[in-house]
Every structure is written in C-alpha cells, then in structure tokens.
Amino acid sequence: MSPVFPMLTVLTMFYYMCLRRRARTATRGEIMNSHRTVESNSRTSPLNAEVVQYAKEVVDFSSHYGSENSMSYTMWNLAGVPNVFPSSGDFTQTAVFRTYGTWWDQCPSAPVPFKRTPANFQSQDYVELAFEQQVYPTAVHVLETYHPGAVIRILACSANPYSPGPPAEVRWETLWSEKPTKVNASQARQFKPCIKQINFPTNLIRLEINSSLLDYYTELDAVVLHGMKDKPMLSLKTSLIDMNDLDEDDYEEKDDCEIDNLNKKFSSTALREGPSNGYFDKLPYELIQLILNHLTLPDLCRLAQTCKLLNQHCCDPLQYIHLNLQPYWAKLNDTSLEFLQARCTLVQWLNLSWTGNRGFISVAGFSRFLKVCGSELVRLELSCSHFLNETCLEIISEMCPNLQDLNLSSCDKLPPQAFSHIAKLCGLKRLVLYRTKVEQTALLSILNFCSDLQHLSLGSCVMIEDYDVTASMIGAKCKKLRTLDLWRCKNITESGIAELASGCPLLEELDLGWCPTLQSSTGCFARLARQLPNLQKLFLTANRSVCDTDIEELASNCTRLRQLDILGTRMVSPASLRKLLESCKDLSLLDVSFCSQIDNRAVLELSASFPKVFIKKSFTQ
C-alpha cells in the first residue's frame, strides 16, 4: 500500500475531530425534538396510569440568592406545589440563583476561565430535586415566574435518595438539553421541553442553569415530574434521523466518549504496530503539542488510539497543565483519576467542581491523585464537591505547597474543624468559602497566615460569630486584598467597616448585600467611598438606609465605579443618581429595584440620558 494512504487516514480523522463542530448547524435541542420515536409513541395500559408529582425535597444546589436561615429567594422554595404561578414578577417565595447575566464575569473577582472546556458544557448552576415515587419520566415541567429561559439541561438519576442502603450503581442520563437562548417572555410560563425516554425509573431530577443571557435574576416556582410506574412500551413506529442532525453533543454520547469509556481508551496499550503514523513524526514535537492544545479531553482520548506517536503526544503531561474535569462530573470516578494520574504530574490548574458526589470519588482516591499530582498545583476548584472531608483538606494542605487559588464554594458538608488546615497554605491569593461552615477560629487563623490574599469570599458563611472581629483581622493582615464578598453577613457594623476601609485601601470590589446591621446614619458608607477610591463594584443590596449623601460621596470619590446595587433603599433620589452617572463614566450596571423614590419614569429618563448604563428595576405584579 502506498505510504500516502496511512497519512491521509490519520489526517482525515484528525481533521474530522478538530473541525467537526463547525460543520454542524443543528442544536442539540432540535435533534432531541426531532427524534419523534419517544415524543408521542409510548403507549400505556389503564393499569399503568401516569403519575404527576411535585418535588418533595431539594437535595442539593450550587447557589441561591437567599439566606441559609430563611426561605426567601432560596432553592428550598422549589419543593412542593407552586407558591406564585401563574403570577409573574419578583416574589420572595421563589427559587433564585445568586447571579445573572455576565456581570459577575466582568468583576475583578472573576476567575480566568479554563481552556479546553467542551463547547457543549455551558452550565453555571444546578439544583437537584427528589420526588416521592420513582417513575419512568414522560415529561418534566418547570414553572418559571420571572425572566424565564435559564434552564439548559435536565437530567435524571438512577439512585433513589430515599433508599435506606447505597445504590449498586448510580447513572445520570440527560433527558433534554439546549444551548443558552434568549427568551423574550414578560409573563410566567410553564416550560415543557420534549424529553428523551430512559430505561430506568427515577425520582431524582437535576436542572442545570445558564443565566448569561438573562436581563435579571430568573425565578423558579416549582417542578412537575410526569411518569409511569412501569416501563412504557415503544410502538413499532420509528423515525429516520438525518445525519446532519447529529451535532457534537449527540456524537459524544453515541460514540463512546463518556468518561468511563475514556478510562478504557486511556489505559489501552493495544495500539497498531508499525510506522503508520501518517508521517506526523516529520513534524516538530512542539508543533504537534501546539495543535493538540486545541482538543478537548474526549478528543485527546480518541486521537490517542490512532497510533503510538499520537498516543505519546496525547499522554504527554504538558497536555494536562490546565485540566477541567467539571464537564464530566456525571461519570468521573476513582478509576478516572487513576488513569489520568500518570498524565497529570505537571498539572497546575485543576477543576473538580461538582464531581465525586454519591460515592463516585472516595477520600482515598482523591488523596492518591493529589499525592502524585499536587506538587505543581496553583489553582484548585472544588465547588460543590461533597465527597470532601477533613482528611481531604489536610491532604491538600500537605500535597499542594504552591497552591494560590482554592474554591470550596457550597461545600456545605465539610465540618467546621476541617477549615483550619487551610491556614497551612500560606501562598493563597484567592479563597472562596461561600456557603461553607467555616467558623471564626479557623477563619482568623487563615487570615493570620495567608496575608497574600487578594480575593476572599465569605458570602453566606453563617457559622462566623462576629464579623466585626473578622473585618478587623482582614484589615490588619490582608493589605493586598482587592475583592471581598460579605454577602448576607449577619452582624457587621460600622466598626468593622472602618477597620476594613482603613486596612485594605486596594479594594476594588465589595459586596455588602443584605447586611442588615449597617446603618448609613453612622457614616459607614460615606467612609467607604472616601477611603476606597479604586472601587469598581459595590453592592449595598437591601440596605434601607442608603441615602443621597452616600451616593454623592461615591460620585465624588469613586469615579472608577462600574457596578452599584442599592436595591430596596427609600432614601435615594433621581437627582443624586444623575450626579453619580455624570461622575462615574464607566458605570455599566445600576440596580435600583424597589427604591421607592425611583419610579419607572425616572428610570426611563436616566436611561435615555445614559444609554450605556443598564439600569435595573425589578417589579412584583
């Protein structure tokens, strides 16, 4: 055979994998909606009546707007029958996630995105709901009461959260997914996507959210699961599937690219013998590495099977310096980490967010991985990784001496004593403890030893007893601090704010939303404005006492301001806002929702005068 043919074969396969996504035009939602074999072709006997049920319990979630000790705007509102629907508007009885739009991605605290994230993974938040009865799902309805369109993926799990013993197997299956789309709907809606039929019963449903295209916070009221107790029989009618319908998402599911199959591919040594590598060995090693940098993890796994030369390149640790495993949370397990271990000896950025839950990753498996791969780690993302315990944090503190960035957001099952180990990571520059059970003693120790901190998130940390003491320590020790999240801290006063403002002059971002003990009459907000001239983002959400004096101080001293949230104040007038907008030329987001002096007419006038500023004013119908 001519030597040209092996080269053509490998090049064709490589070209196909690299450029395939550009050749697809259909969305995944269109594909699933075009597979009509399931949509209307199941039949049931009278004995197999459809079960319709609301969620019994909220099992897990990644974030919410509300407090840990309240029901207002929390994910727990998704349990049970609707509270608001069919009304629309901003209601406290709904479930609301912490962010919307791209505003948080534009802040100084926003982390750099991971490269090589698959284009089909765009989920930002999730919530998992348990239902009373296991059924074979026929429909999932989501009641959206404000700014709909955030749900982009619905999954079902084989595990029964109410089963007394651990499940023999845990499987997640995607029922429906779609790319983020802009929904122009001003009224509440019942979102009823056409779902795929699965071959196991479920009472655990997961919604994944992307709010990047929303104009304001999405609000969800309830979720309804329709299904059959017995497995429905498909009719003989089948559908013909156009090959053009197979987009990348579908291709990855049908072509054995799930992470469990990738494990086998990575460990395979049964590669073809001989020099048939398509003459890739004629290219410089560095050039091949540069080309492979554009491939996702599944693509690397596929390419590794073509020949020994490309297998060597695909297994080179240089390909895994930045490793994002979050998109594969549904399949990633101890075996996955074991197979990746030899390739991750140089890993510097590692994202394990959302992974390992329900026994997928063990403490032993995580520890083995870090003992081999932790020495070069600079950044470690572990948001919502509920397998973590104190041993895991101890291992991190011992095996990751170069760690600068640690995210434990919503790891709410970590015991309070576990956080003391973080104090050993003296080089930390970013620490996210949002919705964790960190206590004051451990936090003060962390602040004492981690004096290089630049970004600190303590939002919704309800176990911290005295935020004034915490703020004083931050001001004394963290002189390099640039961003601080104190969202819903329960007891900080003007004393803590004074220590903070005088000790952290470099602050560019400060979130004091829903901090009820701060009063403008003490001068705390005016002091912030005078002492923090570099502020770009300031959230004073739901502080009723913010007044014109505070706004005028911001206008005079914080001309770099980009985002300001003063939702809920009664004391701010349109005149002071106009001064602010005239002084702060970079201002792009201004939330004046429920500000009693700022009516719709004032918003329209200010928007007309300052068209580059997004002025938000929420409403309740």
UniProtKB/Swiss-Prot annotation:
The keyword Transmembrane helix does not apply. It is found in: Cytoplasm; Nucleus; Mitochondrion outer membrane. CDD domains: F-box_FBXL4. One of its GO terms (cellular component) is nucleus. SMART domains: FBOX (SM00256), LRR_CC (SM00367). The keyword DNA repair does not apply. Gene3D superfamilies: Ribonuclease Inhibitor. Residues 277-332 form the F-box domain. The modification Asymmetric dimethylarginine is found at R28. InterPro entries: F-box-like_dom_sf, F-box_dom, Leu-rich_rpt_Cys-con_subtyp, LRR_dom_sf. LRR repeats lie at residues 376-397, 402-421, 427-448, 452-474, 480-501, 504-524, 532-558, 559-583, 584-609. PROSITE patterns: FBOX (PS50181). Its main location: cytoplasm. Keywords: Cytoplasm, Leucine-rich repeat, Membrane, Methylation, Mitochondrion, Mitochondrion outer membrane, Nucleus, Repeat, Ubl conjugation pathway. PANTHER family: F-BOX_LRR-REPEAT PROTEIN 4, PARTNER OF PAIRED, ISOFORM B-RELATED. Part of a SCF (SKP1-CUL1-F-box) protein ligase complex. Interacts with FAF2 and VCP. Interacts with PPTC7; this interaction promotes destruction of BNIP3 and NIX and mitophagy suppression. Substrate-recognition component of the mitochondria-localized SCF-FBXL4 ubiquitin E3 ligase complex that plays a role in the restriction of mitophagy by controlling the degradation of BNIP3 and NIX mitophagy receptors. Also rescues mitochondrial injury through reverting hyperactivation of DRP1-mediated mitochondrial fission. This is F-box/LRR-repeat protein 4. It comes from Bos taurus. The gene is FBXL4.
